Amino acid sequence: MKYWIGLIASVVIGAQVQAQSDPYSAAVFYPSCLAAGNIVQGKHPAADSPEATNQLRQAAICFGAITAIMNVESYFKPEFAVCPPADTKVTLAQMVLAVTARLKNYPEQRQDNFYRLAVAALAEAWPCSK
């Protein structure tokens, strides 16, 4: 009997460990970036509603992650640098939309690291001349 209990417990524990997702995968950030994309496009519920609070709370994760990326962008390798045209400034809203579009258009990459995908999306949107 102890054998069966131990066997079942190990299977259940193993399944739970395997079911946990990578906290840095793009799949984890995807709902947050969708919410952020909706906010920057003006698609949001009434300002005083619980839905608006939930949307903002969820979007804050994506806004924060992209802001963090841009704060360290100057340390990136040249192939990951972001180079907007000289006379323009890229806004956080534009960056959110670029990253969200990448996540929407390449669902097969959502299991990959969010930060790598976001950096690649930004470098693709605003490439540097070689």
Predicted regions and their residues:
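Acidic, glycine-rich flexible loop segments
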Residues: 84, 92, 97-109, 124
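Sec/Tat signal peptide C-region and signal peptidase I cleavage site
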Residues: 13-22
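C-terminal partner/receptor-binding element of secreted or periplasmic proteins
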Residues: 108-130
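Sec-dependent N-terminal signal peptides
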Residues: 3-13
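Short N-proximal segments of mature Sec-exported proteins
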Residues: 24-95
